[in-house]
Amino acid sequence: MSTGFFGDIQKVRYEGPESDNPLAFRHYNADEIVLGKRMEDHLRFAVAYWHSFAWEGGDPFGGRTFDRPWFSNEIDAAKLKADVAFEFFSLLGAPYYCFHDADVRPEGRNFAENTRYLNEIVDIFEKKQAETGMKLLWGTANLFSNRRYMAGAATNPDPDVFAFAAATVKTCIDATKRLGGENYVLWGGREGYETLLNTDLSRELDHMGRFLSLVVEYKHKIGFKGTILIEPKPQEPTKHQYDYDVATVYGFLKRYGLENEVKVNIEQGHAILAGHSFEHELALARTLGIFGSIDMNRNDYQSGWDTDQFPNNVPEMALAYYQVLLAGGFTTGGTNFDAKLRRQSLDPQDLLIGHIGGMDCCARGLKAAARMLEDGALSKPLDERYAGWNGEFGKRLLSGLSLDQIAGEVEAKDINPQPKSGRQEYLENIVNRYV
């Protein structure tokens, strides 16, 4: 049954590259076969409940700009929000969604009331998933918005806050499991510090390690088959976050013996904030064996903060999905649009148009990446660049020869290497041919 929020808008369909219909896909064709698999199964698109239905359009200098009928802290409003959200999911045709607990339920007076509200909404979600075929990519807990978390959740100096946060995560994992969620995400929005003057760094890292260990232990205890994911971000809202980037998260996981239990959910905007390219973070996660899922958005490259805009740069998407394909593609992960409308984009159809454009951009990037992979456009030059290591001397350097033996061979054979071109411009031109 329609809520009426989206008026007479019909289900979004693929119309091909020549279409000028803003409410149709031009490049995303769910059933198109790419590298032997349906495009939908490659991309595994998800809608973010928080930016799409909970964000009010505020910024640091101004309040709410969106006028939505569900904007109140009442359970009936939360139910209306669920109706509108699932209507949107059906119109768009993305197969997955994601949520924080605080996105979907009212804020209660205490933990028990929060849990009751969450369970009431999960009852509704179960029915709607059965009716629509929608699936949950991942669930998570909001451990950063409420003032109790102003000094962190897992890293809070108050053990009562740690306990409240842990109990909240337990209920959110339960909800995620019940809804068939394929992952559970932890984003440490306030797991960091503003100043070292009031921060015990060693204690806070140990507490965060303990918290994550409890999550992993509970996952196995209840038989949750999904993947536990950490989402790196360098700062904002804190000055310095402990899950700064992929490399930092991997070091943290190794320190606490969790590198085989936890993977990463990499957001493009967070990679940019950390001073990296998106493909760098994806490539490093793949190399370290912790690649899990992605949050797809972009930042404004001039503003210096997290703007969470829909992707619109096909070359960037091509290089990103090239790394995803090199990793073997998604298993439990997917492409979650952690992107929000601009605060002046007030119309309901703007929400559809933003997602349609993002999905088309990702589809173009995926197809370009697949062609580069099939043609060996980047892999062949890379193999040539490192070919020397496949020879007898290269293999001996990596196993068998000691430092003094290497020095002896260099002198005896008069090894005097000459530099070779890295051919960067050539490779960049190759990428541009595909996009």
UniProtKB/Swiss-Prot annotation:
Alphabetical list of InterPro entries matching this protein: Xyl_isomerase-like_sf, Xylose_isom_bac, Xylose_isomerase
EC class: isomerase
MF terms (GO), sorted A to Z: magnesium ion binding; xylose isomerase activity
Record note on cofactor: Binds 2 magnesium ions per subunit.
GO cellular component terms listed in the entry, alphabetical order: cytoplasm
Cofactor(s) the protein needs: Mg(2+)
Principal localisation: cytoplasm
Positions of Mg(2+) 1 binding: 231, 267, 295, 338
HAMAP family: Xylose_isom_A
Identification of the protein by name: Xylose isomerase
Organism: Brucella abortus (strain 2308)
